[in-house]
Amino acid sequence: MEERGTGMGLNPAPSTGPVLAPAPKGILDPSTGKPVGANDPFFLEVNSELSDKGFFVAATDDLITWARTGSLMWMTFGLACCAVEMMQVSMPRYDVERFGFAPRASPRQSDVMIVAGTLTNKMAPALRKVYDQMPEPRYVISMGSCANGGGYYHYSYSVVRGCDRIVPIDIYVPGCPPTAEALLYGVLLLQKKIRRTGTIER
């Protein structure tokens, strides 16, 4: 009498081939076939130290800036048409949350304020009040020509010629309106600035 094969999952035949590792996850580099960043010297050094000792030593400041850049909570201060591009950054095409840049509704829970649009004289006290409600360290991204320097309405009697007259600005994103890619690049520059500045200087 013949034994049944592997049909319907009964009596599975033992596998004699080699056990394969799972395929690498993440965005693959077409030239190497490995995940993007796999050949980064920083990660190679960390991995070698972890495999050697089981832990690695880092400065507290490096740890704090790493955590801070990976969990920036931003609030919108959309004043005009630039706010539409700011909303687009959160949509699936760009998905700024993959960089740890998540939106919040309250200034008390936010690290970053994005000023997008024309700032008028009547709105300036509200902008300053919201900025003062944010906990330290706080950062501001000025998005678009109107927020940067008045833009199209620069000579209007009712427009503030740049929101840097009201709050300190960390990153300026130019354009009228700037594209979502430009704002995304501004976010990456802000993360780079936080890493460079550290906690004590701020």
Swiss-Prot record:
Name of the protein in its database record: NADH-quinone oxidoreductase subunit B
Reactions mediated catalytically: a quinone + NADH + 5 H(+)(in) = a quinol + NAD(+) + 4 H(+)(out)
Alphabetical list of Pfam families matching this protein: Oxidored_q6 (PF01058)
Record-linked SUPFAM superfamilies: HydA/Nqo6-like (SSF56770)
GO molecular function (one): iron ion binding
Cofactor: [4Fe-4S] cluster
Localization, UniProt: Cell inner membrane
HAMAP family: NDH1_NuoB
Main location: membrane
